[in-house]
């Protein structure tokens, strides 16, 4: 894969992120995007690369140490999703800029 192909692939992922309107880790469009991110980063950087593992290990949902019955965690889930989603996009942008050098 040439550097041009790599930057094009990363740019495609960044553009695809803008089409995800429902900020929910169960959203099929989001799940497909995350899977494609991981597969693309593996093809660029390798199976055990920190770049691929960084996005693969992002949770995109709130995981409290202790679940309280009847408690609504939707706000916490949204905050965690937005934080991780923004972090993933920034990582893709950083990786793209590194390849453009």
Predicted regions and their residues:
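Charged interaction/catalytic cores of defense and host-pathogen modules
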Residues: 1-100
